[in-house]
Amino acid sequence: GLEVLGKILSGIL
């Protein structure tokens, strides 16, 4: 869900 997207974004940033 959105949690996964948040984790991915955190990895990119």
From Swiss-Prot:
Tissue note: Expressed by the skin glands.
GO CC terms: extracellular region
Protein family per UniProt: Belongs to the frog skin active peptide (FSAP) family. Temporin subfamily.
Domain of life (superkingdom): Eukaryota
Residues the record lists as Leucine amide modifications: L13
Keyword Secreted: yes
Record-level GO BP terms: defense response to bacterium
Reported function: Antimicrobial peptide.
Compartments where located: Secreted
Keyword Nucleus: no
Protein name: Temporin-AVa
Provenance organism: Rana arvalis (Moor frog)
Keywords noted in UniProt: Amidation, Amphibian defense peptide, Antibiotic, Antimicrobial, Secreted
